[in-house]
Amino acid sequence: MPFVNIRITKDGVTAEQKKQLIAGVTQLLVDTLGKNPATTVVIIDEVETDNWGIGGESVTERRQQAS
């Protein structure tokens, strides 16, 4: 049973976009590895930008500096 965990920043990703991610990742596993879609699990975790760090800074800080 394949298990895929997708972590993204919480940036207003729509329900439709999440649906497309789940379907697309599932299909990729079917096409590439021959996995059964009925037993493929995809979980999307949305992380607040204050809780996601890159290079010692939160994504929130990095985005503020970039703007």
UniProtKB/Swiss-Prot annotation:
Protein name: Probable tautomerase K2
Record's keyword terms, sorted: Isomerase
InterPro entries, per the entry: 4-OT, 4-OT-like_dom, Tautomerase/MIF_sf
Catalytic residues (positions): 2
Signal peptide: none
Protein family: Belongs to the 4-oxalocrotonate tautomerase family.
Enzyme nomenclature, EC number: 5.3.2.-
Keyword Cell cycle: no
A GO MF term: isomerase activity
